[in-house]
């Protein structure tokens, strides 16, 4: 599996992209680390951005603090949601983002299931 990595300056844009997939029934949140869950279970871009903001403020010189990973397991791999979550957590740990806040989205908008992970540098 080869991850696609993009970085950017606007956390709202990448979170909105993923929220649209969730609201359209083409995706869902698999896991959130370091981001408080709401009592109503809904995803809040504002609260997520606030959790990320603490980390981006630590190094204001970073021009593109948002990192977005797309992980595409082989279509032949029939991984459970628990396995996908573990795969995402292991990936983030190995990339050095294991202690950062991040959100793992599962997308099912194309022929294969894939994950999008949003975090900050």
Where are these regions (language model features)?
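N-terminal nicking endonuclease/strand-transfer module with a His-rich metal-binding environment
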Residues: 1-121
